[in-house]
């Protein structure tokens, strides 16, 4: 048999498999776009995300709220204009229909972030009268502005069906038209009544979309930004429900952004300004300030110019594959896809997915160094520091890429050895696809964090996977450090 014939047979087989394996539906998921027309970067990122979803033939695009930065009419309409430019007439480039599956978030319907508003609201508990008389904010006519921006009627809770799959779209409307909060501002008004009067397939997945986190799901029990818990109680009656939320801006690399219990919950990453987990020395997390010992020695990772993640769902007859992608790099994967089996069998739970995941490992011969420097802490204050530097632990055929790193300062005095400081740190481009995150990782200690009375100090570094399992350490040679002088010079 000739090579040409063999190739023809192979092509035919591949085509047959492709036809047999045609997915049931495809959906893109974005959140926290925070569109601001005066910032062209945000518009570009949204446009790029929609073009990526067009190229992948999305049947619909979910947007989990915070479409705008300040909740103004101009921002909301700019979002609609970009949608129409990419999907004119709600059509993909191949002519097929694509559905808008959007909801309002707090930035869209709570104009707290406009100049002068936050301080007034914090002091008086209400919005200023002048704000509520403005015609250029979404809050003052949510339905009218939604229709003007997106060419569709608005309802606080909307139901749409796309390719046979139901979507429940629950807008964050926890303020009345006078700017006053409802009795339970962390809950979607009317949600219990909606589910009581709507029925859903008991086996086929259906999707629920809101901005804030259904309590007790993604991010773990200490995650901030959760709702009151009533949503979770409703969805728990539907094991085939899959919820989407935004709000916390977490990266797509977070394994805790997929939760499965009585139902399934997925946290969408942010399209603008990615945030990390709390407590990392160079992390970017609004929760750090609330910690008893917040990170102090390093500036936050700056994800604003180059951090933009999205999800893409492909629905098959027995599973849903969730691609976690980086829009800055054209939709390249930033982490391995999630696979959610349906019906819900619990295999996507934290416990099931974390079990048996190997620890990352440094490459053979990897070395870590420590040196004294004059640096700046997170507040910008100049001071004496110790810089610990090491290469990233990259993936191999048997081990994953490191999620973050634990760095310990180990002090020795006479016969006593003790850990005097422990830090967690990210690689500089932890939110990019691995092949672009190759630079050295640094972790800074204030010189004052190391007790003066020591014979030697060693720094030990361990790579951790996303579930906190540590690989083998690399360590510096023992060294001594002169008596601490907190500020410049040494």
State each model region's role.
Residues 19-77:
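N-terminal active-site segment of His-dependent metallophosphoesterases
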Residues 24-37, 164-175, 207-209, 264-270, ...:
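Active-site-proximal beta-strand elements of phosphoester/diester hydrolases
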Residues 432-453:
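Signal that preferentially marks extracellular ectodomain short beta-strand elements
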Residues 448-469:
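Beta-strand-rich modules
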Residues 293-424, 470-474, 479-490:
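A short C-terminal boundary segment appended to hydrolase-like catalytic domains
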Residues 195-219:
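Short acidic, glycine-rich surface-loop motifs adjacent to enzyme active sites
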Residues 73-196, 230-240, 253-304, 308-314, ...:
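Extended active-site neighborhood of metal-dependent phosphoesterases/phosphodiesterases
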Residues 417-437:
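Solvent-exposed serine/threonine-rich low-complexity stretches and specific carbohydrate-binding patches
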């Amino acid at each position: 048999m000739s090579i040409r014939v063999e190739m023809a047979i192979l092509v035919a087989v591949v085509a047959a498999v492709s036809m047999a394996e045609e997915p049931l539906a495809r959906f893109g998921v974005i959140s926290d776009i925070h569109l601001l027309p005066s910032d062209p970067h945000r518009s570009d990122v949204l446009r790029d995300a929609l073009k990526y979803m067009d190229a992948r033939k999305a049947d619909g695009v979910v947007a989990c709220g915070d479409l705008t930065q300040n909740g103004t009419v101009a921002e909301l309409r700019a979002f609609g204009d970009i949608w129409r430019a990419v999907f004119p007439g709600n059509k993909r480039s191949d002519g097929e229909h694509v559905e808008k599956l959007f909801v309002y978030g707090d930035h869209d319907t709570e104009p707290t972030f406009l100049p002068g508003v936050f301080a007034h609201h914090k002091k008086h508990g209400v919005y200023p009268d002048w704000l509520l008389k403005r015609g250029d904010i979404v809050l003052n006519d949510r339905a009218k502005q939604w229709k003007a921006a997106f060419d569709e009627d608005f309802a606080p809770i909307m139901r749409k069906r796309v390719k046979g799959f139901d979507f429940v779209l629950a807008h964050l409307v926890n303020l009345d038209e006078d700017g006053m909060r409802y009795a339970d501002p962390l809950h979607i008004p009317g949600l219990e009544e909606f589910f009581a009067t709507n029925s859903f397939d008991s086996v086929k997945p259906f999707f629920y979309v809101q901005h804030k986190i259904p309590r007790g799901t993604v991010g773990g029990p200490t995650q901030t930004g959760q709702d009151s818990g009533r949503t979770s109680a409703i969805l728990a009656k539907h094991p085939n429900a899959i919820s989407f939320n935004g709000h916390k801006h977490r990266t797509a690399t977070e394994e805790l952004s997929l939760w499965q219990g009585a139902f399934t919950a997925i946290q969408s990453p942010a399209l603008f300004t990615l945030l990390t987990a709390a407590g990392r020395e160079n992390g970017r997390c609004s929760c750090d300030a609330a910690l008893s010992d917040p990170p102090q020695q390093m500036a936050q990772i700056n994800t604003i110019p180059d951090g933009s993640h999205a999800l893409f769902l492909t629905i098959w007859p027995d599973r849903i594959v969730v691609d976690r992608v980086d829009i800055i790099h054209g939709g390249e994967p930033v982490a391995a896809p999630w696979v959610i089996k349906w019906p819900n069998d619990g295999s996507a739970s934290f416990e099931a997915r974390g079990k048996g995941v190997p620890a990352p490992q440094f490459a053979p011969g990897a070395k870590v160094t420590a040196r004294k420097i004059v640096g700046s802490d997170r507040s910008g204050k100049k001071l004496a520091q110790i810089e610990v530097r090491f290469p990233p632990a990259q993936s191999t055929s048997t081990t994953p890429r490191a999620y973050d790193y634990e760095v310990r300062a180990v002090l020795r005095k006479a016969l006593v050895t003790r850990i005097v400081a422990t830090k967690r740190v990210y690689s500089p481009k932890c939110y990019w696809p691995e092949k672009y995150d190759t630079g050295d990782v640094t972790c800074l200690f204030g010189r004052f964090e190391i007790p003066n009375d020591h014979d030697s100090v060693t720094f030990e570094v361990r790579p951790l996977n996303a579930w906190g399992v540590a690989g083998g350490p690399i360590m510096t040679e023992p060294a001594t450090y002169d008596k601490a002088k907190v500020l410049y010079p040494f």
